[in-house]
A protein has these predicted regions:
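A common structural junction motif
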Residues: 26-34, 91-97
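Charged interaction segments
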Residues: 44-192
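Short amphipathic alpha-helix segments
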Residues: 21-22, 30-32, 38-52
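Exposed alpha-helical structural elements
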Residues: 16-21, 39, 143, 164
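Short, extreme N-terminal segment that most often corresponds to the first beta-strand
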Residues: 1-31, 188-192
């Protein structure tokens, strides 16, 4: 079974091009609820031969938005970023496609938004303390440790404290789940 990745897109371009992409996405969602990325590419005029061998198994959510020259949408894609972005750039060479990918099953956290224009968060922190679960996104390590200090009542203030926190609970044999995981978004892919 495929691990599903959450992919969020922010696309800049001319109003005409963005409306064409949005229209294709909306048509794809009315066709079927499966393979909406593939269907959107068909509606953009790609032939079956052009799509053959491409990874286009993503499902685009029901709420794409076009506002102030930016098309935004979210997709669930199998194993991570697929070929949808590449095909959009091929059809519309003047667009800029920004994305962020989270695939928690294989610990994949990445973005091509180097400057943080649309996706400024660089960390996702996942915690459990006495079976109380929390997760937050952060732009800086300083923000992470301020938040962790608050939720751990001052116990965790730095990287070494995180390691100690995790080690203490692993060594204790306690039945409750206690952990702190800090996931960093890597900068990858072609810049928009």
């Amino acid at each position: 079974m495929a691990n599903m990745a959450s992919v969020t897109y922010a696309i800049e371009g001319s109003q005409k091009n963005l409306e064409e992409i949005l229209g294709a996405i909306c048509l794809a969602m009315t066709d079927k609820k499966h393979w909406t990325e593939y269907k959107a590419c068909e509606h953009l005029g790609f032939s079956e031969q052009e799509l053959d061998g491409k990874w286009l198994g993503g499902e685009i959510d029901d709420n794409p938005t076009l506002d102030n020259g930016v098309l935004r949408f979210y997709a669930e894609e199998r194993w991570g970023l697929q070929d949808f972005e590449e095909l959009l750039r091929q059809k519309f060479p003047d667009i800029k496609v920004y994305w962020v990918v989270e695939e928690r099953g294989n610990e994949v956290y990445c973005t091509n938004d180097k400057e943080g224009k649309y996706f400024p968060e660089r960390y996702w922190v996942d915690t459990a303390q006495d079976d109380i679960y929390n997760s937050e996104y952060f732009s800086t390590e300083k923000e992470i440790y301020e938040w962790l200090s608050k939720i751990t009542h001052g116990r965790v203030k730095c990287k070494e404290d995180v390691e100690k926190f995790n080690s203490d609970y692993e060594d204790s044999g306690a039945n409750d789940e206690n952990f702190i995981y800090i996931h960093k978004f890597e900068i990858e892919g072609e810049e928009p």
